[in-house]
């Protein structure tokens, strides 16, 4: 299987490893990026694989409360200039109003606003996309927007200030689950197998490797879960400890960031200039 430059770039972005290391790893796995990451972590070629998705597209994240729920909406455009345009923001807010009023699906939102979207594209000169909408239920909800690009809503049993601070933490720390025990068994088993192999490759005896893995797994599930993370406002305590002190709890959260998973086309300026020079010579 031929390895493409795009695959090499994605692996470099996600691991921070060198180009040839990435190309070799992909060649060994026939282009399987996830397997390549695992193999590179085992060999030490990549120390971590934490970069989740290419954050490249522009746009805005908006939040609005409905009755017993909140709606989070992402609308994309091509540049940060248009992301601040009043016409673009008016369109995005109109879509949000409908979402918050009737909890409709993304497909219904797209269909309802398609004519308006096309007119806006013609007016602004950039592609506009109503990308996704998420809903979170709860009697007690707190929201936080970090600029225009990140939006968080947290549901739980706590005072408004506490939930707001938790929402700010979620924006900054990107947890994937509420509690360590919420991490899916498949993900835990995969990481555990990987950590055992890493420990064995370090030359540790089996019994020591097993103890090391227990500690590493506790760290792993803690780092990707909200209550297991160090609280950004009191780093010596976990979020779980803070909630316990306040006799509070979090049942769910949603975090959206503009452009998650969207790969924006990168312009090769040097190639563009070379092409223009070549075209001029032909003329």
Swiss-Prot record:
PROSITE patterns for the chain: EF_TS_1, EF_TS_2
GO cellular component entries: cytoplasm
Molecular-function annotations in GO: translation elongation factor activity
Segments of this protein annotated with the region Involved in Mg(2+) ion dislocation from EF-Tu: 79-82
Subcellular location: Cytoplasm
Primary subcellular site in the record, as a coarse category: cytoplasm
Short name of any one Pfam family annotated for the protein: EF_TS
The keyword Nucleotidyltransferase is assigned to this record: no
Keywords: Cytoplasm, Elongation factor, Protein biosynthesis
Domain of life: Bacteria
Cytoplasm found in the keyword field: yes
Record family assignment: Belongs to the EF-Ts family.
Function: Associates with the EF-Tu.GDP complex and induces the exchange of GDP to GTP. It remains bound to the aminoacyl-tRNA.EF-Tu.GTP complex up to the GTP hydrolysis stage on the ribosome.
HAMAP family xrefs: EF_Ts (MF_00050)
Protein name as it appears in the record: Elongation factor Ts
Organism: Shewanella denitrificans (strain OS217 / ATCC BAA-1090 / DSM 15013)
Gene, per the UniProt record: tsf
């Amino acid at each position: 299987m031929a390895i493409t430059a795009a695959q090499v770039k994605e692996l470099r972005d996600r691991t921070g490893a060198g180009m040839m290391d990435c190309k070799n790893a992909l060649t060994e796995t026939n282009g399987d990026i996830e397997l390549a990451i695992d193999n590179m972590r085992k060999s030490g070629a990549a120390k971590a694989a934490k970069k989740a998705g290419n954050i490249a597209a522009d746009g805005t994240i908006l939040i609005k409360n409905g009755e017993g729920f909140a709606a989070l909406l992402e609308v994309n455009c091509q540049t940060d200039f248009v992301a601040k345009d009043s016409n673009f923001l008016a369109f995005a807010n109109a879509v949000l109003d409908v979402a918050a009023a009737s909890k409709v699906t993304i497909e219904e939102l797209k269909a309802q606003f398609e004519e308006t979207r096309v007119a806006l594209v013609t007016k602004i000169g950039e592609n506009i996309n109503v990308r996704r909408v998420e809903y979170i239920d709860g009697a007690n909800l707190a929201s936080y927007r970090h600029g225009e690009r990140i939006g968080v809503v947290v549901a739980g049993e706590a005072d408004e200030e506490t939930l707001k601070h938790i929402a700010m933490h979620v924006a900054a720390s990107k947890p994937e689950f509420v509690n360590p025990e919420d991490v899916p068994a498949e993900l835990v088993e995969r990481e555990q197998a990987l950590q055992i192999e890493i420990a064995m490759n370090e030359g540790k005896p089996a019994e020591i490797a097993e103890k090391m893995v227990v500690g590493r797994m506790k760290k792993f599930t803690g780092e990707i879960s909200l209550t297991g993370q160090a609280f950004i406002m009191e780093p010596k305590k976990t979020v779980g400890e803070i909630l316990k002190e306040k006799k509070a709890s979090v049942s769910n959260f949603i975090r959206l960031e503009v452009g998650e998973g969207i790969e924006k086309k990168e312009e090769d300026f040097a190639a563009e200039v070379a092409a223009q020079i070549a075209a001029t010579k032909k003329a």
